[in-house]
Amino acid sequence: MEIKKTSLNKLHQDNKAKFVEFAGYEMPIQYSSGIIEEHKFTRSNSGIFDVSHMGQLFIYGDDNLTNDLEKIFPLDLKNLKLNSSKYSFLMNDKAGVYDDLIITKLEEGFLIILNAACKDNDFKILSNLLKDKYKMVLDDQRSLIAIQGPKSVEILNLILKTVADLNFMSGNWFTYKGQKLYVTRSGYTGEDGFEVSISNDLVELFTKELLENGAKLIGLGARDTLRLEAGLCLYGHELGTETTPIEANLKWAISKERLNNGGFIGSKNIISQIKDGAKKIRVGIKPEGRLIAREKTKIYNESEQIIGEVTSGTFGPSVNGPIAMGFVDQEFSKKETKILLEVRGKKYPANICGLPFYKKSYVKGANWWVM
């Protein structure tokens, strides 16, 4: 199957990007300065991420659509304000996660941002669940870029006046070169920032303006280290069809009203796990010393019994040390619990810790993922 390219592919090439294949797309993993420098630049300035491989699903409908979506997602969509966004999940009957997503309420319906590897399957699942009653468009004519970091608001505001007025997890339509684009104040780096949905034919020009104003292109490598420092889940690592939001320590993302009344797909198992406790739970892990524990590293208790597994691990440039997330048996999930990590046949000491590893907020409400 032919590898797809985003509308910014030539710009990536011109900026000497190193590419990898991801979810069927040729995507920039890093540029010439390298992942660590790109990571640090985003934390101190403003980084531009091409995330056009992700799905932008527009579903058009009225109050009936809202009612039908509440049977699917564990959200209080009836009371979601216009242009407000929520983090949520598409789940199976056992509350395993098909995908984690961001859903935004628009005047004519909803915009749902889906993970690249999941978007086609998500579309099929939602089409079946909604029984084709509503117009659904998985829009490949629009690109998606994320502008992240403390200087992003000032840079973007030079191009889109009043974008600084947006609250965290809210959005609005703006006009650029005579065309409409949709901007939300959101992101997945632990920094203040924005995501911009813009037509494919304008995205390169728009991105060049951001670059001229001081932002830099950042690859997916730094996006991963940034999200891990922020303690954020990555689908296929911390989330999947065998893992529930409760096990992933994401109870906060389920509306309280829905927890009380249920009525959404997977609600029976969600409510049961809250009542009885999940057997395994996602935790932060801080290895002692400089050892990096990668995905699938086995986790042991001090008696050297296996109690879990690492799902993501890296060197955290902002904390200047190794960090990891993983799942452990509930009884070993308390902060400061001492554990062992098996790397290349040897066991090394580490500690369970809280999340995020790195905490910084520039806009009210931005630390929505803190555990």
Q: PLM features: what roles do these ranges have?
A:
Residues 93, 98, 113-117:
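Short coil/turn segments at secondary-structure boundaries
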Residues 98-101, 352:
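Short beta-strand and beta-hairpin "edge-sheet" elements
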Residues 81-94, 138-145, 174:
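Short, glycine/charge-rich beta-strand/loop segments that flank catalytic centers
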Residues 1-23, 27-31, 105-371:
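Conserved, structured C-terminal
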Residues 53-60, 89-91, 108-110, 141-147:
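Conserved short loop/turn motifs at secondary-structure junctions
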Residues 1-90, 96, 220-221:
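Acidic, proline/glycine-enriched N-terminal capping motif
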Residues 50, 100, 195:
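Acidic active-site catalytic centers that drive phospho-/nucleotidyl reactions
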